[in-house]
Curated annotation (Swiss-Prot):
Record keywords, A-Z: Glycosyltransferase, Lipid A biosynthesis, Lipid biosynthesis, Lipid metabolism, Transferase
Entry protein name: Lipid-A-disaccharide synthase
The UniProt record lists the keyword DNA repair: no
Pfam family, one: LpxB
Family, similarity comment: Belongs to the LpxB family.
NCBIfam families in UniProt: lpxB
Gene Ontology terms for molecular function: lipid-A-disaccharide synthase activity; phospholipid binding
Length: 376
Protein backbone atom coordinates (compact mmCIF):
# COMPACT_ATOMS: atom_id res chain seq x y z
CA UNK A 1 0.00 0.00 0.00
CA UNK A 2 1.13 3.54 -0.71
CA UNK A 3 -0.73 6.50 0.84
CA UNK A 4 0.18 10.00 -0.29
CA UNK A 5 -1.13 12.26 2.49
CA UNK A 6 -2.97 12.40 5.82
CA UNK A 7 -6.41 11.64 4.32
CA UNK A 8 -4.94 8.57 2.62
CA UNK A 9 -3.44 7.43 5.93
CA UNK A 10 -6.95 7.42 7.47
CA UNK A 11 -8.40 5.43 4.54
CA UNK A 12 -5.49 3.00 4.62
CA UNK A 13 -5.73 2.44 8.38
CA UNK A 14 -9.43 1.55 8.16
CA UNK A 15 -8.90 -0.71 5.14
CA UNK A 16 -6.09 -2.59 6.93
CA UNK A 17 -8.45 -3.42 9.82
CA UNK A 18 -11.14 -4.67 7.41
CA UNK A 19 -8.66 -6.81 5.46
CA UNK A 20 -7.22 -8.20 8.71
CA UNK A 21 -10.69 -9.55 9.59
CA UNK A 22 -10.54 -11.61 6.39
CA UNK A 23 -6.81 -12.39 6.47
CA UNK A 24 -5.54 -12.31 10.10
CA UNK A 25 -1.98 -13.25 9.07
CA UNK A 26 -1.66 -10.72 6.24
CA UNK A 27 1.39 -8.46 6.10
CA UNK A 28 0.98 -4.83 5.00
CA UNK A 29 3.99 -2.89 3.66
CA UNK A 30 4.82 0.22 1.61
CA UNK A 31 4.36 3.88 2.56
CA UNK A 32 1.87 4.96 5.21
CA UNK A 33 1.35 7.34 8.11
CA UNK A 34 0.97 6.95 11.86
CA UNK A 35 -2.61 5.63 11.72
CA UNK A 36 -1.66 2.84 9.30
CA UNK A 37 1.45 2.03 11.35
CA UNK A 38 -0.69 1.83 14.52
CA UNK A 39 -2.75 -0.87 12.76
CA UNK A 40 0.30 -3.01 12.01
CA UNK A 41 1.54 -1.44 8.76
CA UNK A 42 5.27 -1.59 7.96
CA UNK A 43 6.18 1.77 6.39
CA UNK A 44 9.41 1.66 4.42
CA UNK A 45 9.55 5.45 4.03
CA UNK A 46 7.88 8.33 5.90
CA UNK A 47 4.55 9.47 4.46
CA UNK A 48 5.83 13.09 4.47
CA UNK A 49 8.11 12.25 1.51
CA UNK A 50 5.00 12.14 -0.70
CA UNK A 51 3.00 14.98 0.92
CA UNK A 52 4.07 17.64 -1.57
CA UNK A 53 1.51 20.15 -2.87
CA UNK A 54 1.63 22.77 -5.61
CA UNK A 55 3.37 22.67 -8.99
CA UNK A 56 6.54 24.46 -7.85
CA UNK A 57 6.92 22.24 -4.77
CA UNK A 58 6.44 19.08 -6.84
CA UNK A 59 9.02 20.23 -9.41
CA UNK A 60 11.49 21.05 -6.62
CA UNK A 61 11.10 17.56 -5.14
CA UNK A 62 10.71 15.71 -8.46
CA UNK A 63 14.17 14.05 -8.57
CA UNK A 64 13.77 12.59 -5.06
CA UNK A 65 10.15 11.54 -5.77
CA UNK A 66 11.18 9.73 -8.96
CA UNK A 67 14.08 8.07 -7.12
CA UNK A 68 11.74 6.96 -4.34
CA UNK A 69 9.23 5.51 -6.81
CA UNK A 70 11.98 3.59 -8.63
CA UNK A 71 13.20 2.09 -5.33
CA UNK A 72 9.65 1.17 -4.34
CA UNK A 73 8.96 -0.54 -7.66
CA UNK A 74 12.17 -2.59 -7.33
CA UNK A 75 11.27 -3.65 -3.77
CA UNK A 76 7.72 -4.61 -4.75
CA UNK A 77 8.77 -6.55 -7.85
CA UNK A 78 11.14 -8.50 -5.62
CA UNK A 79 8.48 -9.06 -2.95
CA UNK A 80 5.66 -9.93 -5.40
CA UNK A 81 2.75 -8.98 -3.10
CA UNK A 82 -0.69 -10.56 -3.52
CA UNK A 83 -2.09 -7.08 -4.23
CA UNK A 84 -0.94 -3.47 -4.44
CA UNK A 85 -3.30 -0.70 -3.29
CA UNK A 86 -2.42 2.88 -4.20
CA UNK A 87 -4.34 5.35 -2.02
CA UNK A 88 -4.91 8.68 -3.78
CA UNK A 89 -1.59 10.34 -4.89
CA UNK A 90 -2.50 9.62 -8.55
CA UNK A 91 0.60 11.20 -10.13
CA UNK A 92 2.83 8.98 -7.99
CA UNK A 93 0.76 5.80 -7.83
CA UNK A 94 -0.70 5.21 -11.31
CA UNK A 95 2.70 4.86 -13.01
CA UNK A 96 3.76 2.40 -10.32
CA UNK A 97 0.47 0.49 -10.60
CA UNK A 98 0.97 0.15 -14.36
CA UNK A 99 4.44 -1.40 -13.98
CA UNK A 100 3.29 -3.78 -11.23
CA UNK A 101 0.25 -4.84 -13.29
CA UNK A 102 2.53 -5.59 -16.27
CA UNK A 103 4.38 -7.92 -13.89
CA UNK A 104 1.21 -9.83 -12.92
CA UNK A 105 0.71 -8.10 -9.55
CA UNK A 106 -2.97 -7.13 -9.05
CA UNK A 107 -3.29 -3.36 -8.61
CA UNK A 108 -6.15 -1.36 -7.10
CA UNK A 109 -6.47 2.40 -6.78
CA UNK A 110 -8.39 3.86 -3.82
CA UNK A 111 -9.90 7.34 -4.44
CA UNK A 112 -10.47 7.86 -8.15
CA UNK A 113 -8.98 11.04 -9.63
CA UNK A 114 -11.53 13.77 -10.42
CA UNK A 115 -12.05 12.71 -14.04
CA UNK A 116 -15.64 13.95 -13.77
CA UNK A 117 -14.30 17.48 -13.32
CA UNK A 118 -11.45 17.56 -15.83
CA UNK A 119 -9.19 15.39 -18.07
CA UNK A 120 -11.58 12.47 -18.48
CA UNK A 121 -9.30 11.05 -21.20
CA UNK A 122 -6.86 10.01 -18.44
CA UNK A 123 -9.04 6.92 -18.14
CA UNK A 124 -7.70 5.63 -21.48
CA UNK A 125 -4.33 5.21 -19.75
CA UNK A 126 -5.68 4.25 -16.33
CA UNK A 127 -7.58 1.26 -17.78
CA UNK A 128 -4.19 -0.34 -18.58
CA UNK A 129 -2.74 0.42 -15.13
CA UNK A 130 -5.26 -0.98 -12.64
CA UNK A 131 -7.51 -3.95 -11.96
CA UNK A 132 -10.07 -1.75 -10.20
CA UNK A 133 -10.78 1.68 -8.73
CA UNK A 134 -12.55 2.41 -5.43
CA UNK A 135 -14.48 5.70 -5.71
CA UNK A 136 -15.97 8.04 -3.09
CA UNK A 137 -18.97 9.40 -5.05
CA UNK A 138 -21.85 7.40 -6.59
CA UNK A 139 -21.81 9.24 -9.94
CA UNK A 140 -18.15 8.32 -10.60
CA UNK A 141 -18.73 4.67 -11.53
CA UNK A 142 -20.40 5.66 -14.85
CA UNK A 143 -17.11 7.22 -16.05
CA UNK A 144 -15.15 4.05 -15.31
CA UNK A 145 -17.83 1.83 -16.90
CA UNK A 146 -17.45 3.85 -20.11
CA UNK A 147 -13.77 2.83 -20.31
CA UNK A 148 -14.26 -0.75 -19.12
CA UNK A 149 -12.54 -0.21 -15.75
CA UNK A 150 -13.99 -2.14 -12.77
CA UNK A 151 -15.03 0.36 -10.10
CA UNK A 152 -16.94 0.35 -6.83
CA UNK A 153 -18.57 3.20 -4.92
CA UNK A 154 -17.63 2.76 -1.25
CA UNK A 155 -18.84 6.02 0.32
CA UNK A 156 -16.97 9.05 1.62
CA UNK A 157 -14.83 8.91 4.80
CA UNK A 158 -15.83 12.46 5.74
CA UNK A 159 -19.23 11.14 6.85
CA UNK A 160 -17.51 9.24 9.69
CA UNK A 161 -15.43 12.25 10.73
CA UNK A 162 -18.46 14.55 10.66
CA UNK A 163 -20.45 12.12 12.81
CA UNK A 164 -17.76 12.51 15.50
CA UNK A 165 -17.68 16.33 15.35
CA UNK A 166 -19.30 18.47 18.09
CA UNK A 167 -22.85 19.80 17.78
CA UNK A 168 -23.49 23.56 17.68
CA UNK A 169 -24.13 23.87 21.43
CA UNK A 170 -20.93 22.11 22.56
CA UNK A 171 -18.86 23.81 19.82
CA UNK A 172 -20.02 27.21 21.06
CA UNK A 173 -19.31 26.24 24.66
CA UNK A 174 -15.73 25.39 23.66
CA UNK A 175 -15.37 28.80 22.00
CA UNK A 176 -17.11 30.75 24.77
CA UNK A 177 -19.99 31.80 22.50
CA UNK A 178 -23.60 32.06 23.66
CA UNK A 179 -26.34 30.15 21.83
CA UNK A 180 -28.08 33.33 20.61
CA UNK A 181 -24.97 35.04 19.16
CA UNK A 182 -25.04 35.19 15.32
CA UNK A 183 -21.88 33.45 14.06
CA UNK A 184 -20.44 33.25 10.54
CA UNK A 185 -17.59 30.87 9.78
CA UNK A 186 -14.96 31.91 7.24
CA UNK A 187 -12.89 29.11 5.66
CA UNK A 188 -10.20 30.74 3.50
CA UNK A 189 -8.61 27.48 2.28
CA UNK A 190 -5.52 25.51 3.23
CA UNK A 191 -3.03 26.62 0.58
CA UNK A 192 -1.16 29.89 0.94
CA UNK A 193 -2.14 30.93 -2.61
CA UNK A 194 -5.86 30.58 -1.76
CA UNK A 195 -5.49 32.44 1.52
CA UNK A 196 -3.52 35.30 -0.05
CA UNK A 197 -6.10 35.77 -2.81
CA UNK A 198 -9.22 35.61 -0.61
CA UNK A 199 -8.59 36.65 3.00
CA UNK A 200 -8.58 40.44 2.45
CA UNK A 201 -11.89 40.10 0.58
CA UNK A 202 -13.38 37.93 3.34
CA UNK A 203 -12.38 40.31 6.15
CA UNK A 204 -13.94 43.22 4.23
CA UNK A 205 -17.10 41.10 3.77
CA UNK A 206 -17.15 40.60 7.56
CA UNK A 207 -16.89 44.38 8.02
CA UNK A 208 -19.95 44.90 5.79
CA UNK A 209 -21.93 42.18 7.58
CA UNK A 210 -20.98 43.67 10.94
CA UNK A 211 -22.62 46.94 9.87
CA UNK A 212 -25.90 45.06 9.28
CA UNK A 213 -25.50 42.65 12.23
CA UNK A 214 -23.49 44.41 14.99
CA UNK A 215 -23.67 41.35 17.31
CA UNK A 216 -22.21 38.97 14.69
CA UNK A 217 -18.94 37.18 15.44
CA UNK A 218 -16.65 35.54 12.87
CA UNK A 219 -14.72 32.27 13.33
CA UNK A 220 -11.71 31.57 11.08
CA UNK A 221 -9.80 28.26 11.27
CA UNK A 222 -6.15 28.70 10.19
CA UNK A 223 -4.30 25.73 8.72
CA UNK A 224 -0.91 26.72 10.22
CA UNK A 225 0.95 29.57 11.92
CA UNK A 226 1.82 31.30 8.62
CA UNK A 227 -1.87 31.32 7.66
CA UNK A 228 -2.80 32.67 11.10
CA UNK A 229 -0.32 35.52 10.75
CA UNK A 230 -1.65 36.36 7.27
CA UNK A 231 -5.24 36.40 8.57
CA UNK A 232 -4.21 38.58 11.54
CA UNK A 233 -2.53 41.04 9.16
CA UNK A 234 -5.71 41.30 7.10
CA UNK A 235 -7.80 41.90 10.23
CA UNK A 236 -5.42 44.68 11.35
CA UNK A 237 -5.87 46.36 7.95
CA UNK A 238 -9.58 45.84 7.26
CA UNK A 239 -11.32 44.42 10.32
CA UNK A 240 -10.53 46.59 13.33
CA UNK A 241 -13.22 46.62 16.01
CA UNK A 242 -14.86 43.41 14.78
CA UNK A 243 -14.93 40.21 16.84
CA UNK A 244 -12.87 37.55 15.04
CA UNK A 245 -11.98 34.21 16.64
CA UNK A 246 -8.90 32.60 15.05
CA UNK A 247 -8.48 28.86 15.54
CA UNK A 248 -5.48 26.59 15.01
CA UNK A 249 -6.86 24.23 12.35
CA UNK A 250 -10.12 22.94 13.97
CA UNK A 251 -12.15 23.55 10.79
CA UNK A 252 -14.94 21.23 11.97
CA UNK A 253 -15.21 23.09 15.28
CA UNK A 254 -15.54 26.37 13.36
CA UNK A 255 -18.22 24.89 11.09
CA UNK A 256 -20.12 23.35 14.01
CA UNK A 257 -20.25 26.67 15.89
CA UNK A 258 -21.44 28.67 12.85
CA UNK A 259 -24.91 29.55 11.57
CA UNK A 260 -23.60 29.91 8.01
CA UNK A 261 -20.27 29.75 6.20
CA UNK A 262 -18.20 31.39 3.48
CA UNK A 263 -16.02 28.65 1.99
CA UNK A 264 -13.24 28.63 -0.58
CA UNK A 265 -13.78 25.63 -2.84
CA UNK A 266 -12.42 22.16 -2.17
CA UNK A 267 -13.25 19.39 0.25
CA UNK A 268 -14.40 22.02 2.77
CA UNK A 269 -17.57 22.63 0.72
CA UNK A 270 -18.50 18.96 1.06
CA UNK A 271 -17.51 18.95 4.74
CA UNK A 272 -19.81 21.92 5.38
CA UNK A 273 -22.68 20.22 3.54
CA UNK A 274 -22.23 16.97 5.48
CA UNK A 275 -22.27 19.02 8.71
CA UNK A 276 -25.59 20.55 7.59
CA UNK A 277 -24.34 24.14 7.52
CA UNK A 278 -25.73 26.60 4.93
CA UNK A 279 -22.91 28.09 2.87
CA UNK A 280 -21.79 30.12 -0.08
CA UNK A 281 -18.66 29.41 -2.11
CA UNK A 282 -16.27 32.17 -3.20
CA UNK A 283 -12.96 31.75 -4.95
CA UNK A 284 -10.39 33.65 -6.96
CA UNK A 285 -7.60 31.91 -8.83
CA UNK A 286 -4.48 33.20 -10.52
CA UNK A 287 -5.70 34.37 -13.98
CA UNK A 288 -3.61 31.73 -15.79
CA UNK A 289 -4.86 28.93 -13.48
CA UNK A 290 -8.44 30.10 -14.05
CA UNK A 291 -7.97 30.15 -17.83
CA UNK A 292 -6.61 26.59 -17.77
CA UNK A 293 -9.40 25.40 -15.46
CA UNK A 294 -12.09 26.93 -17.69
CA UNK A 295 -10.66 25.16 -20.74
CA UNK A 296 -10.29 21.75 -19.08
CA UNK A 297 -13.30 21.67 -16.72
CA UNK A 298 -16.22 19.47 -17.73
CA UNK A 299 -18.62 20.31 -14.87
CA UNK A 300 -20.88 23.34 -14.58
CA UNK A 301 -20.05 23.79 -10.91
CA UNK A 302 -16.99 24.07 -8.68
CA UNK A 303 -18.52 23.06 -5.33
CA UNK A 304 -19.03 19.38 -4.59
CA UNK A 305 -22.51 19.92 -3.06
CA UNK A 306 -23.66 21.34 -6.42
CA UNK A 307 -21.96 18.56 -8.40
CA UNK A 308 -23.70 15.95 -6.21
CA UNK A 309 -27.06 17.73 -6.44
CA UNK A 310 -26.78 18.15 -10.21
CA UNK A 311 -27.97 21.74 -9.76
CA UNK A 312 -26.87 24.98 -8.12
CA UNK A 313 -28.02 24.97 -4.50
CA UNK A 314 -24.89 26.67 -3.11
CA UNK A 315 -24.18 30.11 -4.66
CA UNK A 316 -20.80 30.13 -6.42
CA UNK A 317 -19.01 33.48 -6.70
CA UNK A 318 -15.98 32.89 -8.88
CA UNK A 319 -13.21 35.18 -10.14
CA UNK A 320 -14.68 38.59 -11.12
CA UNK A 321 -17.88 37.76 -9.19
CA UNK A 322 -15.94 37.18 -5.95
CA UNK A 323 -16.12 40.83 -4.90
CA UNK A 324 -16.72 42.18 -1.40
CA UNK A 325 -20.14 43.58 -2.34
CA UNK A 326 -21.40 40.48 -4.15
CA UNK A 327 -20.23 38.07 -1.44
CA UNK A 328 -21.75 40.25 1.32
CA UNK A 329 -25.08 40.56 -0.55
CA UNK A 330 -25.26 36.80 -1.22
CA UNK A 331 -24.42 35.94 2.37
CA UNK A 332 -27.01 38.42 3.64
CA UNK A 333 -29.61 36.67 1.45
CA UNK A 334 -28.57 33.29 2.89
CA UNK A 335 -29.00 34.69 6.42
CA UNK A 336 -32.46 36.16 5.78
CA UNK A 337 -33.99 33.79 3.19
CA UNK A 338 -35.38 30.78 5.11
CA UNK A 339 -36.39 28.97 1.91
CA UNK A 340 -32.85 29.23 0.49
CA UNK A 341 -31.44 27.72 3.68
CA UNK A 342 -34.08 24.98 3.71
CA UNK A 343 -33.34 23.98 0.09
CA UNK A 344 -29.65 23.60 0.98
CA UNK A 345 -30.27 21.65 4.20
CA UNK A 346 -32.73 19.23 2.55
CA UNK A 347 -30.20 18.46 -0.20
CA UNK A 348 -27.31 18.19 2.30
CA UNK A 349 -29.22 15.54 4.28
CA UNK A 350 -29.71 13.48 1.09
CA UNK A 351 -26.00 13.80 0.30
CA UNK A 352 -25.00 12.67 3.79
CA UNK A 353 -27.25 9.60 3.53
CA UNK A 354 -25.91 8.71 0.06
CA UNK A 355 -22.24 9.02 1.06
CA UNK A 356 -22.59 7.40 4.50
CA UNK A 357 -21.51 3.84 3.62
CA UNK A 358 -19.32 1.32 5.44
CA UNK A 359 -16.40 2.33 3.22
CA UNK A 360 -13.60 0.09 4.50
CA UNK A 361 -15.75 -3.07 4.49
CA UNK A 362 -17.01 -2.38 0.95
CA UNK A 363 -13.45 -1.59 -0.15
CA UNK A 364 -12.11 -4.81 1.41
CA UNK A 365 -14.77 -6.88 -0.40
CA UNK A 366 -13.77 -5.30 -3.73
CA UNK A 367 -10.04 -5.89 -3.07
CA UNK A 368 -10.68 -9.58 -2.33
CA UNK A 369 -12.74 -9.93 -5.52
CA UNK A 370 -10.50 -8.02 -7.93
CA UNK A 371 -7.21 -9.45 -6.61
CA UNK A 372 -8.73 -12.97 -6.30
CA UNK A 373 -7.39 -13.24 -2.75
CA UNK A 374 -7.81 -16.53 -0.91
CA UNK A 375 -7.04 -17.71 2.62
CA UNK A 376 -4.37 -20.39 2.21
Amino acid sequence: MVAGEASGDTLGADLILSLKKRFPNARFVGIGGQKMIANGFESWYPLEKLSVMGLFEVLKHLPSLLRLRKELIQKLLQLKPDVFIGIDAPDFNFKMEGILKENAIPTIHYVGPSVWAWREKRLLKICKQVDGVLVLFPFETAYYDKYGIPSKFVGHPLTNQVADSPDKHSARQQLGLSSDTPVTGILPGSRSSEINLMIDVYVQVATKLHEAYPQMKFVIPCVNQAAKERVALSISLYGKGIDFILLDQQAQLAMAASDQLIVTSGTATLEAALMQRPLILAIKLHPISYWIMKRLATTKWVGLPNVLAGKCIVPELIQENATVDKIAQTLDKLITDKEMREVQLTEFKKQYDALNQNASELAADAVVKWAKLKND
